[in-house]
């Protein structure tokens, strides 16, 4: 047993020694790989020429055998040369970037930016072309792309004008400004005037604009004439535009007038309201004219009319009551007669005649509904003085004492 235990003892140290010897080997490989990786990245980025890098890095290989002596020495002494090499590479990079900046042009600001701008130079040109295409396709006011303040005109000054000419004269750009012009005209005078001023210097779509303006002005004049025949102009009279005003200002004033007429058109029936109550005056005056004489025929006719009409007569009576003040202005004397004991004039309100004394009393004062008018009516005085009148009911006026 002891021998068996003693046998593996000499075998134990080698596995313990192997992990001790492996870490320095791994470190040496990782540092070399790191150096190779750094050199490859710097050469690939263009900071260091590959020829110089290949000549410089073999010198570092001489330090690799030294690492076999001790791990601590290799870490302490090899770190400084590697740092120096990285610093030298960055210095070379800065010098090369300065040279490239001088060669490329004075517009590019700093050394690091110059290298990136050198790498991105073709991308910037393509971006400018894409921006130009986007402006020509998606901008509402197409010809503004060719304005002197646009970035495309500043960057592409060397290009001939023929290359930029097709952009503002495309069909989509001609149709879109007209739509925008219509929208601005509908919005108000400020937007339309400002947009018209901006669009004046453009020569190409001028003829189309003039034609559209002439057509619009003709349509507006025709509409105005039709409206003038149909409705009188409400409100105070408007002064005609002066001769010094431009065509755009005249069109804006016409649009304002049209909008005002459309807005006032909703309130036009207000002044016409007095006319409906004036229509039923003739049947009402028939009752009032029959008030002074003592004929029972007028009373019977009025009562039968109100009873037969029903709802129509009630609605007319309500309209008469509501428009009492308007109807009082008429010059008919019967409207000013005061026969009811409420001491108020006839004023077009429905009245009923007493079958005994012949006095006319308002239906509202007699507490009689317009839909239920009796054939024989007795006023309050007759009821108080002659209680037998109520019993007799249909006492004729000829039998009155």
From Swiss-Prot:
One of its GO terms (molecular function) is zinc ion binding. The modification N-acetylmethionine is found at residue 1. Residues 303-316 have a biased composition (Polar residues). Residues 1-30, 50-123, 139-320 are annotated as: Disordered. One of its GO terms (biological process) is negative regulation of autophagosome assembly. Residues 92-101, 177-186, 212-224 have a biased composition (Basic residues). Interacts with LRSAM1. This is PHD finger protein 23.
